A protein has these predicted regions:
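Transmembrane helix-bundle core of multi-pass membrane transporters
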Residues: 1, 78, 82-145, 171-174
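Internal alpha-helical transmembrane segments of multi-pass membrane proteins, especially GPCRs
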Residues: 6, 10, 34, 58-59, ...
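Hydrophobic alpha-helical elements at and bordering transmembrane segments
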Residues: 5, 9, 45, 92, ...
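Alpha-helical transmembrane segments within multi-pass membrane transporters and channels
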Residues: 50-90
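Helix-loop-helix "hairpin" substructures at the membrane interface of multi-pass membrane proteins
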Residues: 54-60, 66-71, 122-177
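Single transmembrane alpha-helix segments in multi-pass membrane proteins
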Residues: 1-49, 73-79
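Membrane-embedded alpha-helical core segments of multi-pass
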Residues: 9, 13-17, 38, 63-70, ...
Length: 177
C-alpha cells in the first residue's frame, strides 16, 4: 500500500498542475517530459549534494515554469492548437534530454530528496503529506480565489470571459506555466 500511495502522490502532484490547464479547456501533452527534464536537472546539477538544493530546485522550477510559459504563450497569443504545441514541446524535450544524457542514466538524487520517498510521519510518507497539502492549496485557489474563477470562466467560454474583463491570454499562459 505504501508503494501505491507514493506512486499516486507523484502522479497526483503532476495532475494538480494539469488540472489548471484542463479547466481552461486546454491540454498539455508535454508534462511527462517536462517532469523528466526537471528530475534530470535536480539529479545532475545538484551532484547528489543537499547543499546544492538551495539553488538547484529554484533553477529547475524557473526552467520548467519558463517552458510551460512558452507553451501557454504559443497557445494563447500565437493561436497554435494546444495539442500541436504541447506535443511538439514534448518531442523537443525528449530529444534535448537524449542529447544531454547521451542515453546514460543520471546521477542519484540528493539524500534530502530521497528522504521524501523513504521516510514517513505517523506512518504516512512525506511525499503523500506534500501531495495532500498541495491539493488543499490548489482547491483553495480554484474555489476561493479570483484566479480559480477566471480559469473556470475561460473554460466555459473564453470569448465571454474576455468581454467581461478577464485577461484570457495571461491567465492561460499562467495555467500552462
Amino acid at each position: 500500500i505504501r508503494t501505491v500511495f507514493l506512486e499516486s502522490a507523484l502522479i497526483g502532484i503532476v495532475a494538480l498542475g494539469q488540472t489548471l490547464v484542463v479547466i481552461t479547456g486546454g491540454i498539455d501533452l508535454s508534462v511527462a517530459w517536462m517532469m523528466t527534464i526537471g528530475a534530470y536537472m535536480v539529479s545532475n546539477l545538484v551532484n547528489s549534494s543537499n547543499a546544492n538544493l538551495v539553488w538547484g530546485i529554484p533553477l529547475m522550477l524557473v526552467v520548467t515554469f519558463g517552458l510551460g510559459a512558452i507553451n501557454g504563450f504559443c497557445i494563447s497569443c500565437l493561436r497554435v492548437p494546444a495539442i500541436v504545441m504541447t506535443l511538439g514541446m514534448n518531442i523537443i524535450l525528449q530529444g534535448a534530454l537524449v542529447a544531454l544524457t547521451q542515453g546514460s542514466p543520471g546521477q542519484s538524487a540528493p539524500p534530502l530528496l530521497l528522504t521524501l520517498g523513504q521516510k514517513n510521519l505517523l506512518g504516512i510518507p512525506y511525499l503523500v503529506i506534500i501531495w495532500i497539502i498541495m491539493t488543499v492549496v490548489v482547491m483553495l485557489a480554484l474555489f476561493k480565489m479570483k484566479y480559480g474563477r477566471k480559469l473556470f470562466a475561460i473554460g466555459n467560454n473564453a470569448t465571454v470571459a474576455k468581454y467581461s474583463g478577464i485577461r484570457v491570454d495571461n491567465t492561460i499562459i499562467l495555467s500552462y506555466a
